[in-house]
């Protein structure tokens, strides 16, 4: 089915989040005191497993003393793209210069890892959004929609296809992008046959689909698109001026965004 191994967290989630975010801060060269917001995202069912002082503990550990925490959820594995878009909107405030975006997902009971559509692994991903950055990626557009029948597990091929195409066409139009202009698509790590099926539904050619971390990490919820993007960036590299599509599939939801390398 395309996945050989998965990663499992053996320590409290805060330790993994702190380590990942610390690396993003160090890699950006931004002082922790200069970060204005940190936007977290995870799947709905993980919210009840977080410590009541989760955000406070992360802020204290990393020295984010001027940073406002925000949590985005309720869109399952599509929540991280909602968080990315929310973070983009924060820059409408001229006083905001640095925003951290963090996605994490984990499975509490191992028996829940194997699902009909994916094998679940644990992961944390994060990135720093910087006003006026001369290098990196820029979010050009974003789209999300919900299929209520899918949320109830009663959707069908036609309703899923309609959900994907309506959302994706809107995001492409907003960024004045044709699908043929997309260099690569970073998508959700469902079982490989399902990932290929989803790519076909959304018009993505097989050689333009990147779900490479499926093999070693399985499906890590909200982290998949960023894990695949990072893998591609490390192994192949992003081309300045090229556009990249990111996708997030979830029961009843589909979200996507257009990124441009600068």
Q: Which residues does each PLM region occupy?
A:
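Membrane helical hairpin/interfacial module
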Residues: 32-46, 58
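Short beta-strand segments
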Residues: 41, 99-105, 129, 246-249
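Claisen-condensing/thiolase-fold acyl-transfer catalytic domains that form or cleave C-C bonds
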Residues: 47, 52, 65, 73-92, ...
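Short, high-confidence coil segments that cap the C-terminus of an alpha-helix
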Residues: 35, 96-97, 182, 241
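A short glycine/serine-rich beta->alpha loop
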Residues: 3-9, 43-44, 69-73, 112-114, ...
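Phosphate-binding/catalytic loop of phosphoryl-transfer enzymes
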Residues: 92-117, 124, 252-254
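Condensing-enzyme catalytic core mediating Claisen C-C bond formation in acyl metabolism
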Residues: 1-13, 111-170, 249, 258-262
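Conserved active-site "lid/cap" helical segment
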Residues: 1-37, 148-183, 193-206, 228-232, ...
């Amino acid at each position: 089915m395309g996945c050989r191994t998965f990663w499992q967290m053996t320590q409290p989630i805060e330790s993994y989040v702190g380590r990942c975010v610390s690396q993003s801060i160090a890699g950006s060269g931004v002082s922790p005191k200069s970060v204005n917001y940190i936007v977290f995202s995870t799947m709905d069912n993980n919210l009840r497993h977080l410590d009541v002082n989760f955000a406070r503990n992360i802020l204290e550990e990393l020295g984010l003393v001027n940073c406002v925490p925000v949590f985005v959820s309720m869109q399952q594995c599509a929540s991280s793209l909602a968080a990315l878009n929310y973070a983009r909107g924060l820059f409408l405030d001229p006083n905001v210069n640095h925003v951290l975006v963090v996605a994490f997902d984990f499975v509490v009971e191992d028996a829940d890892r194997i699902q009909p559509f994916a094998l679940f692994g644990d992961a944390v991903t994060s990135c720093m959004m910087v006003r006026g950055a001369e290098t990196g990626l820029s979010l050009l557009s974003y789209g999300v929609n919900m299929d209520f029948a899918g949320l109830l597990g009663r959707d069908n091929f036609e309703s899923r296809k309609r959900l994907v195409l309506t959302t994706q066409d809107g995001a492409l139009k907003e960024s004045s992008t044709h699908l043929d202009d997309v260099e690569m698509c970073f998508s959700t790590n469902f079982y490989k046959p399902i990932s290929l099926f989803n790519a076909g539904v959304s018009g993505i050619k097989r050689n333009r689909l990147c779900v490479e971390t499926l093999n070693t990490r399985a499906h890590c919820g909200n982290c998949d698109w960023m894990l695949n993007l990072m893998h591609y960036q490390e192994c192949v590299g992003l081309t300045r001026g090229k556009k990249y599509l990111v996708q997030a599939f979830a029961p009843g939801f589909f979200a996507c965004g257009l990124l441009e390398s600068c």
